[in-house]
């Protein structure tokens, strides 16, 4: 694998201050959070694929709004069909059972067979209803796998992922567009050896790539980091700017 499966660090962290400005609506049977740029343009879209805390987590919604403030129409779907994991969930929790659908009321799993169609519905909606000319995708942790899986012409034009999880090497080898990665120096899911493997693969596939390594931070810093810790706050803000600049470079016409 280019990164390892999700662990408990994937739902632990801190809630940030601020009030989301976007709206919740339905695309078919999928709830989505959308946020518009100041000029209301949908020419350039960003699809955010969240970590397992999900699209209703206020931190994720605030990040979506920040991408919108930087000139992008943003859609962020419920990848888990109502079965996201609460932040800092107490008690025992079996990640394997969760992935297999054991905790979902209808037994819906959280594997590609279920998640891929959600991503495809949203991409189609962005292309058809919203007439997005170019689509960039952001994947945090769990969502990073699906950025990599769909980074092909006609789906996603540009990709970005922070502290990705559960990506197979074959998936990374299959990308057909520019990909940027924000990595944490302290990350059991995307450790140094996996970063190095990923770098070798990205060199081989030949598309533009970027891997930024942030010291002093752990898995999840891009969404759930402690904003009271200066090093973490800097890394989170820098990783966000990394994504915006990546999209500006590879999505927008010069």
UniProtKB/Swiss-Prot annotation:
Keywords: Hydrolase. Disulfide bonds: none annotated. Pathway: Secondary metabolite biosynthesis. Its EC number is 3.1.1.-. Pfam families: DLH. It comes from the Eukaryota. This is Hydrolase tropI.
């Amino acid at each position: 694998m280019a990164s390892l499966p999700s662990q408990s660090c994937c739902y632990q962290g801190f809630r940030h201050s601020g009030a989301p400005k976007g709206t919740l609506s339905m695309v078919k049977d999928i709830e989505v959070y959308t946020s518009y740029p100041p000029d209301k343009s949908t020419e350039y879209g960003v699809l955010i694929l969240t970590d397992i805390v999900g699209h209703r987590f206020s931190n994720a919604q605030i990040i979506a709004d920040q991408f919108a403030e930087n000139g992008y129409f943003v859609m962020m779907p419920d990848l888990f069909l109502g079965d996201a994991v609460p932040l800092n969930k107490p008690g025992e929790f079996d990640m394997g059972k969760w992935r297999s659908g054991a905790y979902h009321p209808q037994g819906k799993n959280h594997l590609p067979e279920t998640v891929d169609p959600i991503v495809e519905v949203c991409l189609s909606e962005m292309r058809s209803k919203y007439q997005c000319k170019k689509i960039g995708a952001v994947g945090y942790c769990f969502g990073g796998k699906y950025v990599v899986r769909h980074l092909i012409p006609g789906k996603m034009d540009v990709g970005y992922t922070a502290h990705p999880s559960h990506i197979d090497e074959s998936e990374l080898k299959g990308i057909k567009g520019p990909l940027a990665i924000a990595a944490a120096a302290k990350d059991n899911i995307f450790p140094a050896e996996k970063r190095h493997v990923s770098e070798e693969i990205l060199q081989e596939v030949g598309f533009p790539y970027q891997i930024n390594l942030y010291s002093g931070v752990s898995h999840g810093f891009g969404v759930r980091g402690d904003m009271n810790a200066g090093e973490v706050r800097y890394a989170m803000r820098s990783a966000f700017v990394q994504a915006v600049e990546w999209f500006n470079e590879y999505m927008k016409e010069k």
